[in-house]
Amino acid sequence: MSRGFVKEGDQEETPIVTPRAVLPDGTPNYVTPTGLELLKQERETLVSEQEANKDNRIQYNYLTAKILQIDERINSAEIVDNANKNNGEIRFGAWVTYLNGQNQKQTIRIVGVDEADAVHGKISFLSPLAKAL
């Protein structure tokens, strides 16, 4: 259709959606049981926000895109539950205490990319530190 027949107000803006944490192609989407629950809770929150924004097309489309992103992560999730396997091995889901460069003890947990939160001591299994351990 020629632009001459299109009203200015008919043009929908494409929402810019920030990508989720990087998960390289071919890398399994490992998640802890807690991580999967957090993804599901995030999805529920987004769906509620989407319902509340039915009249705001731009916000509605933005939330739809976010829901599609999270659905992709939930559908590709591979649950790894090592929480009760405390045999001294460093593995996905394990809490690890180590001495940092300043000889201070630090405790971290190795988790999936979406659950990673350095402030709370949770690092991605893809991080250099997790790989080094």
Residue ranges and their predicted role:
Residues L36, S76, I108-V111:
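Broad hydrophobic/π-residue packing in well-ordered secondary structure
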Residues D81-L133:
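Non-DNA-binding regulatory cores of transcription-related proteins
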Residues E8-D10, I16-V17, P24, I74-A77, ...:
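A short linear-motif detector with a strong N-terminal bias
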Residues E13, R20-A21, T64, Q69, ...:
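Homeobox/homeodomain signature
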Residues M1-R73:
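Helix-rich terminal scaffold detector
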